[in-house]
Amino acid sequence: ETLNYEETAFDGKTLALTATELALLRKLAENRGHIVTYDALCAAVWGADYYGYENSLGVHIRHLREKLEAEPGAPQFLRTVRGIGYKLTKGEEA
């Protein structure tokens, strides 16, 4: 199976993202500065019948962070809100 990548710009750099990564980034960007729940992200990517994808979400977020962040282990843009979801920030927000 061949993965198709789409190019998009983020924080002044061009990124090659998979369809799943792009869908996640779009959902987070639409809600920039606000928490997006795990359920909302899964539904946006995999549809209403996303049961079983919750663990996959973390893997895709990690891959997205590796592309977005200078230091993926200490993210400045894509923040985890423990027990709730994720938040895309402008980099300086907590």
Task: Map each language-model feature to its residues.
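HATPase_c (GHKL) ATP-binding subdomain of two-component histidine kinases
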Residues: 88
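Positively charged, aromatic-enriched patches within helix-turn-helix-type DNA-binding elements
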Residues: 12-77, 82-84
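Catalytic strand-loop-helix junctions within cyclic-nucleotide turnover domains
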Residues: 49, 92-93
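Short, intrinsically disordered, low-complexity terminal/loop segments
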Residues: 73, 93-94
